[in-house]
C-alpha cells in the first residue's frame, strides 16, 4: 500500500531538491564546467594581443605562437586557382589579403584550443573587425563547416554571390587540395 507523504514533508523535499539543483549549477559554473558566454561559445582558454605576422591565408604568428583562424579555411600557399585559363597563385593572394587586413594594427585574439598541428585556434579582431569573417566575406577563405558552427556561412554566400576573391576563379576546396597532395606523396 502507498504511504501518503505529509504536506510539510513534501514541501521540504521539493525545497531541498531545488536548493541542490541551484548549488549544482553554481558549482559547475564556478568550478570550470563548460562555461558558455552570451553567444553560446566556450569561453576562450586565453587571450593574446599584439602585432602579428602572416604565415598563410588562415594562419598568423603572434608573440612567437602560431594561431589558426578558427572557422575558416583559406587556399594553401602553394595552391593555385584558374582565371581565364591561366594559373593564379590564390594561396599567396589570400595571404597577401590577410596581411593587408591586419597591416601593422594590433590584434586581439581569443584562443580556444589547438588544432592537430599544435597551432592555437583563435578568433582574432582588429579595430573591432572579425578577421576570419572579413577574409570569408572578401572571398579569400571558405567557411570551414568541419570545425565550426557555420558562423561564416553567410559571409561565404555573399562572397560567392559577388564573385569576390577565389569565387571569381575556378578553385579546388583547400581541404580537398591538401588531401590530394597527401595521397600523391
Show which residues each predicted segment covers.
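Small beta-barrel nucleic-acid-binding modules, primarily SNase/OB-fold domains
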Residues: 1-185
Amino acid at each position: 500500500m502507498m504511504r501518503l507523504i505529509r504536506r510539510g514533508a513534501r514541501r521540504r523535499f521539493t525545497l531541498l531538491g531545488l536548493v541542490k539543483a541551484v548549488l549544482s549549477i553554481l558549482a559547475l559554473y564556478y568550478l570550470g564546467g563548460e562555461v558558455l558566454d552570451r553567444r553560446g561559445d566556450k569561453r576562450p582558454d586565453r587571450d593574446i594581443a599584439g602585432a602579428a605576422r602572416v604565415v598563410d591565408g588562415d594562419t598568423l604568428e603572434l608573440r612567437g605562437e602560431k594561431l589558426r583562424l578558427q572557422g575558416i579555411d583559406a587556399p594553401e600557399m602553394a595552391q593555385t586557382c584558374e582565371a581565364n585559363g591561366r594559373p593564379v597563385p590564390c594561396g599567396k593572394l589570400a595571404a597577401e589579403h590577410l596581411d593587408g587586413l591586419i597591416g601593422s594594427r594590433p590584434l586581439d585574439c581569443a584562443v580556444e584550443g589547438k588544432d592537430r598541428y599544435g597551432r592555437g585556434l583563435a578568433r582574432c579582431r582588429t579595430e573591432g573587425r572579425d578577421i576570419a569573417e572579413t577574409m570569408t566575406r572578401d572571398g579569400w577563405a571558405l567557411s570551414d563547416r568541419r570545425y565550426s558552427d557555420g558562423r561564416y556561412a553567410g559571409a561565404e554566400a555573399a562572397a560567392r554571390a559577388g564573385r569576390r576573391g577565389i569565387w571569381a576563379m575556378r578553385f579546388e576546396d583547400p581541404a580537398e587540395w591538401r588531401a590530394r597532395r597527401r595521397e600523391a606523396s
